[in-house]
Amino acid sequence: MDNHGILESLLFTAGDEGLDEKQLLEILDMSKNQLVELIENYSSHGLMIQRFGTTYVLTTKKEAATYIEQLIEQKSQMKLSQAAMEVLSIIAYNQPLSRSDIELIRSINSDGAVKTLIAKGLVEAKVVNEQRSQQLITTDLFLNVFGISNIEDLPTTEEDDEEMDAFFSNLVNQKGENND
């Protein structure tokens, strides 16, 4: 990997805090002039390196601002009601299952919550094994939102309570003000 790639990786890992010039010079084993030249020659399609005092930060280019604002708006719309969170967890742990299966588990009509989850792209309805009713399953977006690679990565009852609490607090953080 070249120095541009290493610098980009370091700044990406450091996140919003960035890295102090001294740290970069030490890690990259180069002079200040070499670092300045490296940054001046840095080019990425959507990223740039900015200096704030003696700290360097990997940031997005200003031209991407409107697209980033759209993404942030979409993410803010991902908030879920308590009912939708409950239905989502039922589907995640028991998939595939039908709407009637969810109603049996919850003892209440869940159509509103299911429609919300489908509309937000967290759940999809599919015909599984030629069954008469559509079966609900989680999507790749669900995996992405909850930071897991596959459904088997969901916490199980055998795992630490802390891990379960962390997963469900992530769900609670998605809670919106609307009730389904």
Curated annotation (Swiss-Prot):
One of its GO terms (biological process) is chromosome separation. Pfam families: SMC_ScpB. Keywords: Cell cycle, Cell division, Chromosome partition, Cytoplasm. The keyword Lyase does not apply. It is found in: Cytoplasm. Transmembrane segments: none annotated. GO terms for cellular component: cytoplasm. The keyword Cytoplasm applies. Participates in chromosomal partition during cell division. May act via the formation of a condensin-like complex containing Smc and ScpA that pull DNA away from mid-cell into both cell halves. Belongs to the ScpB family. Homodimer. Homodimerization may be required to stabilize the binding of ScpA to the Smc head domains. Component of a cohesin-like complex composed of ScpA, ScpB and the Smc homodimer, in which ScpA and ScpB bind to the head domain of Smc. The presence of the three proteins is required for the association of the complex with DNA. This is Segregation and condensation protein B. It comes from Staphylococcus aureus (strain MSSA476). The gene is scpB.
